[in-house]
Every structure is written in C-alpha cells, then in structure tokens.
A protein has these predicted regions:
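RNase H-like nuclease fold core
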Residues: 2-94, 98, 102-110, 200
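Acidic/histidine-rich catalytic cores and adjacent linkers
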Residues: 145-206
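Inter-helix linker motif
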Residues: 108-126
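Metal-dependent DNA phosphodiester-chemistry modules and their immediately adjacent helices/loops
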Residues: 124-154, 158
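Short acidic, glycine/Ser/Thr-rich loop/turn "cap" segments at secondary-structure junctions
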Residues: 59-62, 83-88, 121, 137-144, ...
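A general structural motif at alpha-helix termini
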Residues: 1-2, 156
Length: 206
C-alpha cells in the first residue's frame, strides 16, 4: 500500500502543468516532520507553489521538503516547474526572501515579481511596541492602499516623517523592497486583492 501511495504522489509531483498561470504564489511553511532515518520529529521547510489558472481556479503545483528556506533551493523549484511545461507566469507573489526575485527571473525573465504586502506589514510591526501596532498598521495602510505608485511614495515619505524618529527601521525596509512593491499599484483593485498576500498558501497548512 505504501509503495502504491508513493508512486501516486510521485506521479502527481511530476505531472505536466499548464503552459501559463496568470498568478503563482510561492512560499515556505515551517512544519514538524518525522525524519525517515532517525525517526525523530524535526522542523523542516515545506516549499509550496500555488497557481491560479486561466479559469481563476487555484491549483497546488508542487510541494518540496528541505531543511531550510533559501533562494538557491527556490531556483531548483522554478526550473522544476519549467521542466514540467510551465512556460509563463505573469505575476509571482513571494515573501521577502533575499535573492528570491533573481531566482524567479533566472527561469522566468519576464515575470512580474510582487512581494507579499501583508508579509511586509507584519515584518514592519515587529519593530513596534505593542501599544503602537494598531496605529502604525493604519499608517502603513495609506501606503499600500494608494491609488498609484507616486501616491504610495508620498505616503511612504509621510510615514517616515511621522514615525521615522521612533521606528527608524520601517521605512528603509519598505524602500529596500520597493521594486517588488510597486508592481502592485499597476493592477486594478480586484487583482490587488488577490496578490496582496501569500495567505492562500498559509491556509493550506490549517
């Protein structure tokens, strides 16, 4: 029975994919997995690719297990997707992992890489005291709910004027990620709502 299940999983993991997915979410979850050799339960990263196909339906493209999340491993995943027939991704929604955009563009040079806005907000709020988190979160909302990238840049400057003295790390963190933030503002509200977060992947873990 086990061999039959493993064969089925292997077939699923290597199945052919559609030639194009308008949106692909890429993220990693830290989960406890029992090691096959040591029989010990260890924390490992499960890498996930979740696609939204041309019919608007969500489809898990693959799951990969590794000891830690890293851009090098993501490159191998992108190559795996391409080898299975996925030729084009319009928008890749990712977390803030360093080197992630480069890994995606190595396999898909024309893909728009969009950072997960919610991930960036959560990272920002970690710099804040508990009592300030609500008001800082409201101020950050002025950035990502701006009408366009110019309005967003002004909102970021206004945020830094107001909060930069108390929390000097937040605005620079947004600026470092800015090239992967600004594609967001080119899309209509309906698309923004979809690509705002990689929570679609996190929900698979529940």
């Amino acid at each position: 029975v086990t061999d039959a299940v493993l064969d089925e999983v292997n077939d699923w993991q290597n199945r052919a994919l559609d030639r194009m997915y308008p949106i692909v979410f890429l993220d990693a979850l830290r989960v406890k997995i029992r090691d096959a050799e040591s029989r010990q339960v260890k924390n490992k990263a499960v890498y996930l690719a979740l696609g939204v196909n041309s019919d608007g339906e969500r489809e898990v493209l693959g799951l990969w297990v590794a000891n830690a999340e890293g851009a090098k491993f993501w490159l191998s995943i992108m190559n795996n997707l391409r080898n299975r027939g996925l030729e084009d991704i319009l928008i890749a929604v990712v977390d803030g992992l360093k080197g992630f955009p480069e890994a995606i563009h190595a396999a898909y040079p024309d893909t728009t890489v969009q950072t997960c806005i919610l991930h960036l907000v959560r990272q920002s709020l970690r710099f804040c005291s508990w009592k300030d988190r609500k008001i800082v979160g409201k101020a950050l909302k002025q950035i990502y709910q701006a009408a366009d990238d110019q309005a967003a840049e002004k909102a970021l400057a206004d945020f830094e004027d107001e909060w930069g003295g108390k929390y000097p790390s937040i605005a620079p963190a947004w600026r470092r990620a800015w090239q992967e933030v600004i594609p967001f503002f080119a899309f209509p509200p309906a698309v923004r709502k979809i690509i705002y977060t990689t929570n679609a992947i996190e929900s698979l873990n529940r």
